[in-house]
Regions:
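Extreme N-terminal starter segment of soluble prokaryotic enzymes
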Residues: 1-3
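Short hydrophobic/aromatic-enriched beta-strand-loop microsegments
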Residues: 24-30
Length: 127
């Protein structure tokens, strides 16, 4: 399965997604700015194998980390909205969500990708 990492405003993946759909190639579009509002993420261990799932709660589609065979990191953006009503809690949620995305990118760095925040911006990383 192809993980397409982008944002809601990016229209460039649309023709690619249409082609993938016609060709029967499984994919999952992950709009990173909506991480806290449109997605549910779970980490789990089954039979001593660690995996994770990302579910789009709007479309009810899910991808397992173990299903990801390639990644197209198109235009990810930092999460910009949470369901927290308290301003301090909202700030913390957004900071934690951004840190999670960085960790996710590093955990997937050995999967074939087009575009990579890990390798394309090495000098910019503070990790």
């Amino acid at each position: 399965m192809i993980l397409i990492v982008t944002n809601k405003e990016d229209t460039h993946p649309t023709p690619v997604i249409e082609h993938l759909t016609k060709s029967g190639v499984p994919f999952f579009r992950f709009n990173t700015e909506c991480l806290l509002t449109d997605y549910a993420i779970e980490w789990f261990c089954i039979n001593n194998i660690i995996d994770f799932s990302i579910t789009n709660t709007i479309t009810n589609t899910t991808i397992l980390g173990s299903q990801i065979k390639s990644i197209w990191e198109r235009r990810p953006e930092k999460p910009n909205k949470s369901n927290a009503t308290d301003p301090t809690a909202n700030k913390i949620c957004l900071e934690e969500a951004n840190a999670f995305l960085v960790d996710l990118q590093y955990s997937l760095k050995n999967i074939f990708s087009i575009g990579s925040a890990v390798y394309d911006n090495v000098a910019a990383s503070k990790l």
